[in-house]
Amino acid sequence: MSGHPSGIRKHDDNECSGPRPPVPGEESRVKKMTEGVADTSKNSSPSYLNWARTLNHLLEDRDGVELFKKYVEEEAPAYNDHLNFYFACEGLKQQTDPEKIKQIIGAIYRFLRKSQLSISDDLRAQIKAIKTNPEIPLSPHIFDPMQRHVEVTIRDNIYPTFLCSEMYILYIQQMSAQQERCTSSGATGSGSAGSSGSGGSSLAGACALPPTTASGKQQLPQLVPPGAFINLPVSSVSGPPAGTCSASGSVYGPSTSASSSGSISATDTLPRSSTLPTLHEDSVLSLCDDFEKVQMQEGGGSLGSGSVGAGARAPDYPIRLTRDLLIATQKRRLEIRPPGAHGYVYNPSTTNTSYVPNSRVDSERASVSSGGRTDSDTMSISSCSMDGRPYIQRRHSSTESKAIRQSAMANKETNTFQVIPRTQRLHSNEHRPLKEEELVSLLIPKLEEVKRKRDLEERARERNPGAALLTNERSSASDRAFAEAIREKFALDEDNDQDILDQHVSRVWKDQTPHRSPGTMSPCPPIPSRRRTATHDSGMVSDGAMSLSGHSMKHSKSMPDHSSCSRKLTNKWPSMNTDSGISMFSADTVTKYKDASSRSGSSTASKLEEAKRRLEDEPRRSRRYAQPPMQHLSQQPLASFSSSSSGGSISLPHQPPPLPAKPPETIVVFSFCEEPVPYRIKIPGTQPTLRQFKDYLPRRGHFRFFFKTHCEDPDSPVIQEEIVNDSDILPLFGDKAMGLVKPSD
C-alpha cells in the first residue's frame, strides 16, 4: 500500500485477478477494485475452517460434532467413551430439575463403571455420599474435573490426527467446491457486472477460502498441517466452474512461474480453469509459442479490441481440447516428456516400487502370450521363388518353431515368480550388538517372568504335595514298564561260533546221507533262542516254541525234519516272525506233520533206539551248549505258552485294555454374600486358578474373591484369603476350595 500513493493496491500473481461478485440487491452499482479487496478481508472464514483453530470451535458446531464422531467411531474407537462422557457432561450442565440431575448423574456413573475411563477416589466417595444421604444438594458440575481431564486427552491425542485425516480434508474439499459452485451460479444469474470497464480479465466466481493478507498469502487456521487443503483441486468433486482464482492463487498455493527476468509467468499463459495442465515428472512448466498462438486464436473472437493488453492474457473461460491444439503442442509435449517414460506406463499405485527391466524369460513369455511370430511363421508357403527354400524345409521349420513356442513355458526358469516380501527381508540394524543398558532392559523382564512362574509352581507344590508325589510315581511306573517291555522285545542272545559250525555240518551231512540209520544219527544242535523267539502280541507261536515244550522228537528217515525247514524259512524270511494275526503253522503243514507221525509210529524199535540215544547224549549236549542266564529268562514266558506236537498253535490270552483314568478334578464350594445356599462346581485340574473359577461363576460383574485357608497363627488357624490376580492358584481347604464372593463397590 505504501508503494502506491493513489491508494489502489496492485494485484500480484498470488491473488484473485478480478473483483468479488456483486452482493444481491447491489447489482446496479459497479464496485471498484478496492471494495472487492476490502470485502475479502472483512468476511469471516467458513465454519468448517474454524474447526482447526481450537477444539471448542469443533465441538460447538453441529456439523463438526457429527464429523468428529464419525471419525472417532471409524478410526479411533478407543476414544468413544471419552467423547460420549464429554457430551453427557455438557448435557448435564444444561439441566435445572434436581430429579433430572440425579438421574443423569446415576446414569453417567453407571456408564463410567462399565467404560474404560478411570474414576478418581474423590469422585467415587462423593457419589456414594449422594446415594446414601439424599439431603446433600446435587450439582450439575460434579464431573467437571474429570471432564477437563477428558478434554485434555482428546485435544492432545485424537484432535490433531483428526485435522490431518483424509475425512476432514475431503470434507473441506467438498464444501469449498459446493460454495464456489453456488457463488458462480449466483453471479451468472445476476449478470456480468463490475468487469466490463476494468480493462482486464475478471472472474465469474470467487474463492471460498480464508481471507488473504496484504502480502498476498493465506491466513491459514491454526493446527492445520501444511498441505491439508491448499493443494487439493476443487474440481475433483464438482465440474469446473465458470471461473475461479488463478492457477497460482490461493487454491493451489504459490505458482510455478518463470524467472524474474521479465518473462511471462505461468499465470499469464495458463487458461482460467479450475484444473491445471498435466506437468510431467522431472520437467519444468514452460509453454511454447505455438501453444500461445493457438490460445490467442481460441480467445480472439470473444475478446474486444481493448480487452487484450500488451501481455496478451488468455481468455477467462477454459479452452477446449481440439485437434489443432494437439497438433500445435505435439512437438513441445514430446520434448518435455521425461526420457524414462518412453515405453513405460506410469502407475500411481506403484510409484514407490523399483522398476526392473524385462529379462529374457519375461520377453519370451510376453512374445508367446501375445501371439508373436518368428520369421519362419511369416514366410510364404505358396511359392518357392520368395525365399529359395523348398516347401518341405519351410514346413519343417514352422513345425519346429511351433514346438519351441509350446515348450517355452516348460523350459522357463523356476524361480522367476519367487518374491521375498519386504517385511521378511533382513536388515543390518536388526543384527547390531545391543548396548549394555538395552540388553539389561530386555533381559530383566524375561527373567522376572521366569522367576514368577517358578515361584507359582513352587507354591503349588507346597500346597499340594500329594499331587506331585502321585505324578512322580506314575511317571516312574510308566518308565519301568516301558523298560521291561523293551528288554523282553529285544532280548537277544549272542550266537556261539560252535553252534553255527555244528548247524552247518549237520545240514551238509543230512543232504549227503539221507538214508542214515537212526542209531548213528548225530544230535542236531539246538537252535539259538534268537531264531526261536515267539511273538507275544497276537497269539502267534513259531516253531521255536514248539521245540521248547519238550515233546518234539527226532523222527526216523521217513519223517521230514520240520525244525530244519522252519529254521531255513526263519533265516530266509525274517518277516514271518512279525505280527500278522495268523498262526505260522498252516493247515497243510499240520496235516503233513500228523501223517508223518502216524507213519513213523509203526516202528516201535526205532522209537526205543532213538529215545535211548537221546538220553545218552543229553548230558554231553547240556555241557557243550550251555546257554547264558539271560537265555533261560527269555525262554520262560515262551515255554508256558508252547503247544504240544499233536496240536496246532495256541494263541496267547488276550488281556482287555485298562480303563482310561478319570481326569483329575477339583471341587470348589462358594457362595454369594446375599444368598444362603452355596454353589458346588468341579473345575478340571488339581491346581485351578482364579481365571478358571471366574469362568464358572453364574453371574457377571465386579466381585472380590475370598477363600478359606489354613494359617500358622494359633489364635486363628483358619482365615479368609483374598485372591486378586487371575493367574494365582486357589488355596485348598482339605481336598476342596471354599470360596466367598463379595460384590465390589
Swiss-Prot record:
Keywords per UniProt: Cytoplasm, Developmental protein, Phosphoprotein, Wnt signaling pathway
Q: Where are the transmembrane segments?
A: none
Feature: compositional bias, Pro residues? 654-663
Q: Does the keyword Cytoplasm apply?
A: yes
Q: Where is the composition biased (Polar residues)?
A: 266-275, 347-357, 366-385, 561-581
Q: Where is the composition biased (Basic and acidic residues)?
A: 607-620
Q: Which PROSITE patterns match?
A: DIX, RGS
Its GO biological process terms? cell development; chitin-based larval cuticle pattern formation; dorsal/ventral pattern formation, imaginal disc; eye-antennal disc morphogenesis; follicle cell of egg chamber development; glycogen metabolic process; heart development; imaginal disc-derived wing margin morphogenesis
Provide ranges: composition bias, Gly residues: 188-202
A GO CC annotation given for this chain = plasma membrane
**What ranges does the record give for the region Disordered, renumbered to this chain?**
1-45, 183-204, 243-275, 339-401, 508-581, 593-663
Return the InterPro entries for the record.
Axin-like, Axin_b-cat-bd, DIX, DIX_dom_sf, RGS, RGS_sf, RGS_subdom1/3, RGS_subdomain_2
User: Which compartment or compartments is the protein found in?
Assistant: Cytoplasm
RGS domain location is 54-172
Task of the protein:
Inhibitor of the WG signaling pathway. Down-regulates beta-catenin (armadillo=ARM). Probably facilitate the phosphorylation of beta-catenin and APC by GSK3B (zeste-white 3=ZW3).
Assembly mode:
Interacts with ZW3 and ARM. The interaction between AXN and ARM occurs via the armadillo repeats contained in ARM.
**What protein is this chain from?**
Axin
Instruction: Specify the species.
Output: Drosophila melanogaster (Fruit fly)
The gene coding this protein: Axn
